[in-house]
Curated annotation (Swiss-Prot):
The keyword Transmembrane does not apply. The active site is at H325. Residues 134-572 form the Urease domain. GO terms for biological process: urea catabolic process. One of its GO terms (cellular component) is cytoplasm. This is Urease subunit alpha. Ni(2+) 1 binds at H139, H141, K222, D365. It comes from the Bacteria.
Length: 572
């Protein structure tokens, strides 16, 4: 039998079992755990498109029609990185969803084929490339629509949050308040190649005004201290969420005016809730909001300006905070408010809590103390910093960082999907889910995608000069593709709403073009459901020194002076 060297095979068909891939310029190494393309019984039946290659009529391309099972699109020889595994596979897409992950080809001439290539099948060659599920940013201030373009080009395909544009309330809080604004924002969402869900304002002590927002189409409610996150408002908001199977996200009381962290925990009453920017620089009970990391019903997340902890982190935060929360540097009380939120001890501990799997999610806090295009980038910078400072995780050996990689990819994919009741549609590369897929060259993993698919259509890609004779000449930059235009846009993206809104027929009432999907299964979600990130330690924060301990272990680390995925990739 003819043989080929491992290197030559990887260069031709991509890595296979036992091969390792470095993720961009980080120190993280992924090792292929399984190769689904070998289901034919071994090597030799791989599919590849191109002149003289195998995906040709009568070879790896069958005669089967779409009705007979041929796929719409097949991504060949992809290295899949997801919470469930790091595997080599072909991926079949049909009707805008993932139809199969396995072995592609022609079942009439090849054994073991479960993804049929036919004359009606498009091919995206992923040999040597990494494929991930589209990212989810669950902390969006919808301040300007251009955020969506920026996020999509970074690999984010779902944005959850609130706002109405650059209104003062939106600059500070992630709320789309009231039925009129909710209707307008749902109508605006039709224009963008992005899955979108809105949060209403949850700060009220009586339920009627909250119920009308749920029925108008929000997927949950946001409690924000700038609107008054009192125990009364918290309790009322939680009652409404329980009645409607929606989520509550909380930005608690930094000043401890209406109560301390213990009072907030008591008002929540053991019910599930999303804790935004759990460390506290983004807001929350000072100095010990990190206490909630030890509560099973709090689903903790970080926003990206504090991630990872670097020598510049503290300096930039005061000015950011003053702008975002409409504060005046000439007023001593405003300045004290800002400074109370910025503590190097808790910021340093935040990195380690992520590495332990105790903080479950990552998000941006877009234009409101966070950078919308850096959720994925900051996640992998944190993973690399923790490997450099803490070494390999106990679950990982000397050969690879697979467990750490799965832990960190889950923070911006499956875990926010579970927390917000949308994991039936998005959050992972699994059969039946919406085909929101990001393709990366390994050298650019986590920082600059090669292309982003929305609902099976290419929505954005790194594309060269449109007047060039081939697609690659400079200037290469992100350009919208056909999936981002016309009727294709509306059919390639989802708008998430509440079950109550779906039952009320908001799509017809508001004249919405996009397909709606109702959030569900939220109220029973707990920390233990956060994939690879369910550790719930006993938390202690010293009120005088701000030192942090988890299960008695002191959590501290140095600020980084160098990071991967940084200036090397952003020369211009």
């Amino acid at each position: 039998m003819a043989t080929v060297s491992r290197r030559a095979y990887a260069e031709m068909f991509g890595p296979t079992v036992g091969d390792r891939v470095r993720l961009a310029d980080t120190g993280l190494v992924a090792e292929v755990e399984q190769d689904f393309t070998l289901r034919a019984g071994g090597y030799g039946e791989e599919v590849k498109f191109g002149g003289g290659k195998t995906i040709r009529d009568g070879m790896a391309q069958s005669q089967r029609t779409r009705a007979e099972g041929a796929m719409d699109t097949v991504l060949t020889n992809a290295l899949v990185i997801d919470h469930w595994g790091i595997v080599k596979a072909d991926i079949g897409l049909k009707d805008g969803r993932v139809a199969a992950i396995g072995k592609a080809g022609n079942p009439d001439t090849q054994p073991g084929v479960d993804i049929v290539i036919g004359p009606g099948t498009e091919i995206i060659s992923c040999e040597g490339n990494i494929v991930t599920a589209g990212g989810i940013d669950s902390h969006i201030h919808f301040i300007c629509p251009q955020q969506i373009e920026e996020a999509l080009a970074s690999g984010i395909t779902t944005m959850l949050g609130g706002g109405t544009g650059p209104a003062t309330g939106t600059l500070a809080t992630t709320c789309t308040p009231g039925p009129w604004h909710i209707e307008r924002m749902l109508q605006a969402a039709d224009a963008f190649p992005m899955n979108i869900g809105f949060l209403g304002k949850g700060n009220a002590s009586l339920p009627a005004a909250l119920h009308e927002q749920i029925e108008a189409g929000v997927i949950g409610l946001k409690l924000h201290e700038d609107w008054g996150t009192t125990p009364s408002a918290i309790s009322n908001c939680m009652d409404v969420a329980d009645a409607t199977d929606t989520q509550v996200a909380i930005h608690s009381d930094t000043l401890n005016e209406s109560g301390f962290v213990e009072n907030t925990i008591a008002a929540v009453g053991g019910r599930g809730i999303c804790a935004f920017h759990t460390e506290g620089a983004g807001g929350g009970h000072a100095p010990d909001i990190l206490r909630v990391v030890g509560e099973d019903n709090f689903l903790p997340s970080s926003t990206n300006p504090t991630m990872p902890y670097t020598r510049n982190t503290l300096d930039e935060h005061v000015d950011m905070l003053m702008v975002c929360h409409h504060l005046d540097a000439a007023i001593a009380e405003d300045l004290a408010f800002a400074e109370s939120r910025i503590r190097k001890e808790t910021i340093a501990a935040e990195d380690i809590l992520h590495d332990l799997g105790a903080i479950s999610m990552m998000s941006s806090d877009s234009q409101a103390m966070g950078r919308v295009g850096e959720v994925i980038l900051r996640t992998w910078q944190t993973a690399d910093k923790m490997k450099q400072q803490r070494g390999a995780l106990p679950e990982d050996g000397a050969r690879n960082d697979n467990h750490r990689i799965k832990r960190y990819v889950a923070k911006y994919t499956i875990n926010p999907a579970i927390a917000h009741g949308i994991s039936h549609d998005v959050g992972s590369l699994e059969v039946g889910k919406w085909a929101d897929i990001v393709v990366w060259k390994p050298a650019f993993f986590g920082v600059k995608p090669a292309m982003v698919l929305k609902g099976g259509s290419i929505a954005v890609a790194a594309m060269g000069d449109p007047n060039a004779s081939i697609p690659t000449p400079q200037p290469v930059h992100y350009r919208p593709m056909f999936g981002a235009f016309g009727g294709s846009l509306a059919r390639s993206s989802l708008t998430f709403v509440s079950q109550a809104a779906m039952a009320a027929g908001v799509r017809e009432r508001f004249g919405l073009a996009k397909q709606l999907s109702a959030v569900r299964g939220i109220r029973g979600v707990r920390k233990q459901h956060m994939v690879h990130n369910g550790y719930t330690p006993r938390m202690e924060i010293d009120a005088q020194t701000y030192t942090v301990r988890a299960d008695g272990q002191l959590l501290t680390c140095e600020s980084a002076t160098r990071l991967p995925l940084a200036q090397r990739y952003f020369l211009f």
